[in-house]
């Protein structure tokens, strides 16, 4: 007989709408509003990884373009059609697309919403590390405000886009070919797994960490 579903859920089961913060995220000295976040990882008791649900209204971005020395990051598009800003170029994304940013590569990134509709993202990364350093290629004024500036970031070729959401620049700066750090789960699934000696099929999955070269986070898309 199937177990009865419980009417009351434990504290580590929550809906993102009950956790969303106020719409005031911005950099010091700037009145530009960024994404609206819900800190899922912290609210659910996770201490080693950070997981956020983020909403991007039209014309906003998740952050200034940046690269980090010691913290990995992963972005999954739940809804909408944002652009991934990577090393000065825009790459269009859609629902089900995933982007991975290994630490220490100097790969500069941000997610921009140049569309007319809201975008929803699931963003995962490592919790803040004291040894982490950060670099803002388009905002050098941040250097004076931060003690964690990344001075010896690996050099990378930079494209012409300045990282600011601007629908008038969108078509001229958008790239056609995708980078290896952008994948859609629908083209990457592996056959359903099962335990040895048992023919019960489990979930059908995609190992994003392995595909992106992310070594300190285990990130999978699973379909049941």
Tell what function each PLM region has:
Residues 103-131:
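Ligand-binding loop in jelly-roll beta-barrel domains
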Residues 1-48, 136, 140-221:
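A short, N-terminal "cap"/entry segment at the start of jelly-roll beta-barrel domains
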Residues 63-68, 110-113:
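Short histidine-centered beta-strand/loop micro-motifs
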Residues 53-58, 67-85, 124-126, 221-224:
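Short, conserved beta-strand element in jelly-roll/cupin
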Residues 74, 81-83, 90, 108, ...:
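Structural motif
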Residues 88-103:
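Short acidic-glycine-tyrosine-enriched beta hairpin
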Residues 58-60, 96, 104, 224:
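Tight coil/turn sites that cap or link beta-strands
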